[in-house]
Amino acid sequence: MNAPSRPHLPRGPYLLCDDSVLPEISLVDKAARLVAGGARLVQLRMKRTPIREALAATRQVVALCRREGALCLVNDRVDLALLADADGVHVGDEDVPAEDARALLGPGRLVGVTVRDVVGARAAQAAGADYVGLGPVFPTSTKQVPAPVLGLEAFASVVRDSPLPVVGIGGVGLVNIASVAAAGAHCAAVVSDALLAADITERVRRLVEAFEQGRFGA
């Protein structure tokens, strides 16, 4: 029997559906608004949600994304990704090691890893990762203890030498997503700029357009 094919990481905005941002709106509702705006990659980040509620929400968002042709990844929780049949996981320094995530998920799902430099990107590749999240590119308030800001020049340098596709993370929004794309990013992660917009769906549409403009130099 052939191994299941791994999803392809789509280029463009990488939208995070975070339970700590706009908590009065459900994760499923937030994800629906993101996808309606053209998001093709949604990551569920559920640090505050009880496990059973998180599992139910993940299953609903996975189903939503499948219907709309988008991918759904889960932050940190490999168990939730497996139980909900998500498209993959993203792990950080304090999460399940990438090689263990790959062993648990098998070859048919994506594994992303947060790194700080080219050395980390090479280690992630050796561990079986499909892509790396690199940053923070800009100052960010989403993380309680953010790492030192890279800036666009250092970010672009790592992108050039990385053996894996790079997702720009940290402080990315409509005002700067084009510059992240122009620096060579495969994707650009957006959290608050999308979820706190007056119209989430319209903001995502504009983020998609801005990324493409930066990517192609329009």
UniProtKB/Swiss-Prot annotation:
Pathway: Cofactor biosynthesis; thiamine diphosphate biosynthesis; thiamine phosphate from 4-amino-2-methyl-5-diphosphomethylpyrimidine and 4-methyl-5-(2-phosphoethyl)-thiazole: step 1/1. GO terms for biological process: thiamine biosynthetic process; thiamine diphosphate biosynthetic process. Pfam families: TMP-TENI (PF02581). 4-amino-2-methyl-5-(diphosphooxymethyl)pyrimidine binds at residues 43-47, 75, 114, 143. Condenses 4-methyl-5-(beta-hydroxyethyl)thiazole monophosphate (THZ-P) and 2-methyl-4-amino-5-hydroxymethyl pyrimidine pyrophosphate (HMP-PP) to form thiamine monophosphate (TMP). This is Thiamine-phosphate synthase. Disulfide bonds: none annotated. It catalyses: 2-[(2R,5Z)-2-carboxy-4-methylthiazol-5(2H)-ylidene]ethyl phosphate + 4-amino-2-methyl-5-(diphosphooxymethyl)pyrimidine + 2 H(+) = thiamine phosphate + CO2 + diphosphate; 2-(2-carboxy-4-methylthiazol-5-yl)ethyl phosphate + 4-amino-2-methyl-5-(diphosphooxymethyl)pyrimidine + 2 H(+) = thiamine phosphate + CO2 + diphosphate; 4-methyl-5-(2-phosphooxyethyl)-thiazole + 4-amino-2-methyl-5-(diphosphooxymethyl)pyrimidine + H(+) = thiamine phosphate + diphosphate. It comes from Myxococcus xanthus (strain DK1622). SUPFAM superfamilies: Thiamin phosphate synthase (SSF51391). Keywords: Magnesium, Metal-binding, Thiamine biosynthesis, Transferase. The gene is thiE. The keyword Transferase applies. GO terms for molecular function: magnesium ion binding; thiamine-phosphate diphosphorylase activity. InterPro entries: Aldolase_TIM, ThiamineP_synth_sf, ThiamineP_synth_TenI, TMP_synthase. GO terms for cellular component: cytoplasm. Its EC number is 2.5.1.3. It is an enzyme of class 2 (transferase). 2-[(2R,5Z)-2-carboxy-4-methylthiazol-5(2H)-ylidene]ethyl phosphate binds at residues 140-142, 171, 191-192.
